């Protein structure tokens, strides 16, 4: 993320009193918002975005993982002036998962067919294909698996794939190695099915102009919390809502 974008998004987090993760280590979560409603505490994951234009950038290589995550997030978007030295915040939008769904669904529609093809094609790989790619062996080593699937698995996952014992040593069976080959094929195909930085469109964002989704100062945090609270009350079973206590 460019330094300027990161600084603006940190500013938004402070204004809206969000819990910011500077390393984005919560599985790609920018921040979280905790709210109390009727003696219960709830948590919403927040996607924090900023823009100096009329659209909003998202991410590189957007695939189905992004789609699934976005459907469980509150979007807080700050729109800034285009001044080179110090862009000033003009206005903000706070959009719920249901607000974002039409745009998210439009992105899903663009990539879904390719992701289905990736899944179906990988399932058709058989042992003959494994032998052609990795050589014909009775069993395979972790090193063989790493050459195939590279850094897509952790050391623990590679160790767990050793499903066969020969003497005192563990190996990977042909069946398990074929599964790894299928996973690798699916991963490669899915990489080609992603979209590069699809923008949240002006047409979608304009539908919220003049509504209560526009957050104004000076009580920025209160505005976001009201939108979040109304969302939880209206959609108590939504997957985005996490009950803390």
Please give the residue ranges for each predicted region.
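Nucleic-acid endonuclease domains
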Residues: 1-43, 50-245
């Amino acid at each position: 993320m460019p330094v300027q974008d990161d600084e603006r998004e940190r500013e938004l987090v402070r204004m809206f009193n969000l819990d910011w993760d500077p390393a984005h280590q919560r599985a790609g979560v920018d921040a979280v918002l905790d709210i109390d409603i009727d003696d219960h505490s709830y948590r919403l994951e927040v996607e924090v975005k900023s823009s100096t234009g009329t659209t909003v950038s998202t991410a590189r290589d957007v695939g189905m993982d992004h789609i699934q995550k976005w459907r469980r997030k509150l979007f807080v978007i700050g729109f800034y002036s285009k001044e080179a030295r110090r862009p000033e915040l003009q206005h903000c939008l706070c959009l719920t998962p249901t607000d974002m769904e039409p745009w998210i669904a439009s992105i899903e529609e663009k990539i879904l067919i390719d992701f289905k093809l990736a899944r179906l094609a990988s399932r058709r790989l058989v042992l003959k294909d494994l032998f052609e790619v990795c050589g014909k062996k009775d069993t395979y080593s972790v090193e063989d698996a790493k050459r195939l699937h590279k850094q897509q698995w952790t050391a623990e996952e590679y160790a767990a794939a050793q499903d066969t014992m020969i003497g005192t040593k563990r190996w990977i069976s042909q069946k398990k190695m074929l599964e790894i080959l299928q996973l690798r094929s699916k991963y490669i195909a899915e990489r080609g099915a992603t979209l590069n930085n699809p923008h949240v469109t002006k047409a979608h964002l304009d539908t919220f102009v003049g509504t209560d989704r526009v957050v104004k100062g000076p009580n920025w945090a209160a505005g976001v919390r009201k939108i979040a609270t109304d969302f939880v009350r209206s959609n108590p079973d939504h997957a985005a809502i996490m009950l803390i206590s």
